[in-house]
């Protein structure tokens, strides 16, 4: 299949990778590279030097790990460090939405942030609204003087003004507002956009849906308390960061609240629409779009959701002991229910109301202090505030009185008391028995609210159900208010003008040869406004960790297929670097918490827990001994000098990533390779179609080279090609793993054969193809089995799957028994896959029945048979089976070769398979089509599914009859 990639769209949305600028254009400055190639999010590297907790680092990676290359160095303590790190990333996230060469306005931002990165196109409106703003300008002047004295590259004046955004006359089509809207509000931002001629604005604010409901709350990730104070136009909201002495923030509630409650605003003939995009890390990203196009009137609706608010009941209690002012207190629904259930049974009307309230208060104290599970108090409940406890007990007592009175009235109303009473209750009151004892005055008061008789004990509502969502609806601006419009023809004129302008700019760039210049090596650091200059750093410069050799020149592809392949190869380089950095970061964290320093480790006991979970975690002592008996060989280790090879007299720590630490070498080698131009043909065959046999038949000695995804596949192919000399130098040279080929190089070949190509990253395959200088790639695999998976949940793969130019499909299997055909067809139907090649697959196997299943209660019911291969979906089940296998007469080599996860087993072919699930807890892999397909198609003769308990959505259970 030919590639059909839109080049302009690709550059705008994905782009190339400016992290390896030397690989694209040698000796080009980063700014020229960004302007010529792309201005994509993933081309930015952000160094965060703040010390973030594990939870904060995970949240930061989850929010921006796919958009930027994050380097968390954990160097400095800083006030509200996560908020500062997020603020830096938010700048680039918002700026990357706009054309890279157009001017941009920053409302309320820091001019230093853009000046230090040489981003001359951004104009900052930095008004002095108080002494804090004035002090910030002085601090920025200090930083500017420092950078001017340390570097000769800065000769531009910062692009900013001291005007309010509404009063500035600088014009631009785009704008950002990073936490600058608190004092402007939605309509204030619209006024600023109107004065600047801005069409699209993107910004961020701290967000908590409970602000619409409560008077105070807490943003857990930012560790920020907020509190609403005052009322009406004077109401403010205060933000205080927990356990920090930095200045707090106070803003008008009407301004901040407008981002939650309003959606549209009109100024003259322009309509401004607010859209809330994303809520992550307690920060909401939004955009405001201006339009002059004619549009019909519509109702705009949005909802603000409160997390877990439905678990509570609102209890009305008097505020400051006033009969006229009441406030709502949230009490856990389970607490209120249990208090009412117990107190209702013990309630006695003959007692004084204070005695009944004491009983309610006693039950309330017990139920709000503990949570009972299975008859035992095993966890603390949600204690009430000391100021609210007595009033909540009072309100619940009066609520019980109300219910008894209403039940009494209901029973009395059900008795026959004549036609007059019947007419009054059924027709006049509409069957509402609650009015029986309130009298005519209360009835009239309910119809005329001005009488204000709804705060008495017999009519007040003490309990209210809380909704977990606040709904807002607003009409778009009426047509009568729009005085000027662009017509549809005007819109098309704008489109044509943009295209012509782009063509003109391209022509000028082609006519002008950019001068050669060295990429600056300085790193410039930025900090949040309220922290020290060292606290946060973010670099936009290309990564200089991998510098190509001077003689290596990487050509920049210009065709759509080349651009796609270039992006895949750069993604593979970034992925390898990410995994290497993760390994180093994990080991650094372990070294720090264990008190490692020099040749001493202060707290060796911490390794006991880690070693019990993973026996590859160990400590090498300076005397040459190991803290635990050495079972594995390690190539590198970690200490205060970093990750790398160590000497016998050094103290260092290791884990499983130290056994074969080659990711950095793979990344460096891959970064030097140009994009290959060879064609890629895919042989897409069903499971057991004889792909290894096909490789053997297609292989031509002296012309072809074979590459596999892993060592086991390479050994199988060598055994098939060279059964007698599979360990010879010839066999080892022509059949290689992809990692080995990249690290050590490969001989040139005419054709590259790839086994289990789906397990390789697309960029990894392209790197091997480029190194081999082949003219054709013949890839063998199954596009419906397990594909390449990222080992970093925060790294989003855009080019992981293989892209081919031609595809040949094979429908015949020689391995799978006949009943597997039906089981896989059922699997595909349950997954809704109607276009699968397995819909028409056939089998040459003589085995008609092979699938069975058996219920077990523990791993002790699994008998280890040396003639079977045991598969699991999870590493935990695999470890449990390996422990179980030690009770049987099998060797360690047998355990390593015959107990695998399904992912590890892809590509193998054995006679008998047992798939084991030892837990009934949630496991999404049993719902994944590709994993279940691999599990069902590894055997030739028999397959047994041993499962412990029912698991919702278990495809294996449903497909094995």
UniProtKB/Swiss-Prot annotation:
Instruction: List compositional bias (Basic residues) regions by residue number.
Output: 503-512
Outcome when changing residue 396 to A: Reduces 1a membrane association
Give every (+)RNA virus helicase ATP-binding domain span.
Answer: 655-810
Q: How does it sit in the membrane?
A: Peripheral membrane protein
Give the residue ranges for region: Disordered.
503-541
Q: Name one GO biological process term.
A: methylation
The UniProt record lists the (+)RNA virus helicase C-terminal domain at: 811-961
Could you name the domain of life of the organism this protein comes from? Viruses
Q: Which residues form the Alphavirus-like MT domain?
A: 71-260
Can you provide one Gene Ontology molecular function annotated for this UniProt record?
A: ATP binding
Q: Disulfide bonds, which pairs?
A: none
The record's listing under Pfam families reads: CMV_1a_C, Viral_helicase1, Vmethyltransf
**One GO CC annotation:** host cell cytoplasm
Q: How does it assemble?
A: Interacts with RNA-directed RNA polymerase 2a.
Function, please?
A: Involved in the virus replication. Contains a helicase domain and a methyltransferase domain. The methyltransferase domain is probably involved in viral RNA capping. Involved in the formation of ER membrane spherular invaginations in which RNA replication complexes form.
Protein name, per record? Replication protein 1a
Annotated organism of origin: Brome mosaic virus (BMV)
**Upper lineage:** Viruses, Riboviria, Orthornavirae, Kitrinoviricota, Alsuviricetes
